[in-house]
């Protein structure tokens, strides 16, 4: 079973995340930010992951630390749960429509950290979440998981729909990338390591 539980405590946040790649063993999300909870729930549901997130952050300051640190720990969970990455597909690309919006996320579980984020989020706040922290979340996940992550909105108007499209596409792209293919011997790289 590919799974991980990681705790991270700083003066700004206390976070514990449990991730199960192979079984949708339950989804429980509590970050203290309703909109972030909603997005992580969508991510786990559409990625078919078991995900438990418990976070207490300094929301009296702002949502930045909670959002970024949640991304860090989620990325660390993916890295740990994937282990040596034997037999995984490695790549995933998904387009997800949300009414007038179309989002795309592509990932490469390459061992190299990189984020390309191309989404104009015109509404500065969604519930308790500053929309500028959406990019911070994806950067934190990409760097902690050591993966390439490209997230973009091809078109759309509603900021909620844009962010929701990206989180759903991220879940589906990660599902594709972590899937074990019995035809892949070792790791999916000519280098022999990823």
UniProtKB/Swiss-Prot annotation:
Its main subcellular localisation, reduced to a broad class, is cytoplasm
Presence of the UniProt keyword Cytoplasm in the record: yes
* Keyword list, A-Z: Amino-acid biosynthesis, Cytoplasm, Histidine biosynthesis, Lyase
What GO annotations for molecular function exist for this entry? imidazoleglycerol-phosphate dehydratase activity
> Its encoding gene is what?
hisB
Tell me the PROSITE patterns matching this sequence: IGP_DEHYDRATASE_1, IGP_DEHYDRATASE_2
Protein known as: Imidazoleglycerol-phosphate dehydratase
What is this enzyme's catalytic activity, as reactions? Answer: D-erythro-1-(imidazol-4-yl)glycerol 3-phosphate = 3-(imidazol-4-yl)-2-oxopropyl phosphate + H2O
Q: Where in the cell is it found?
A: Cytoplasm
UniProt keyword annotation of Methyltransferase present: no
Q: Which GO terms describe its cellular component?
A: cytoplasm
Set out the biological process GO terms recorded for this chain's protein.
Answer: L-histidine biosynthetic process
What Gene3D superfamilies does the entry give? Imidazole glycerol phosphate dehydratase, domain 1 (3.30.230.40)
For this UniProt entry, which residues form the secretion signal? none
Q: In which pathway does it act?
A: Amino-acid biosynthesis; L-histidine biosynthesis; L-histidine from 5-phospho-alpha-D-ribose 1-diphosphate: step 6/9
Q: Which Pfam families match?
A: IGPD
Q: Which InterPro entries match?
A: IGPD_sf (IPR038494), ImidazoleglycerolP_deHydtase (IPR000807), ImidazoleglycerP_deHydtase_CS (IPR020565), Ribosomal_Su5_D2-typ_SF (IPR020568)
State the similarity comment.
Belongs to the imidazoleglycerol-phosphate dehydratase family.
Could you tell me the EC number(s) of this protein? 4.2.1.19
Q: Taxonomically, what lineage is the organism?
A: Bacteria, Bacillati, Bacillota, Bacilli, Lactobacillales
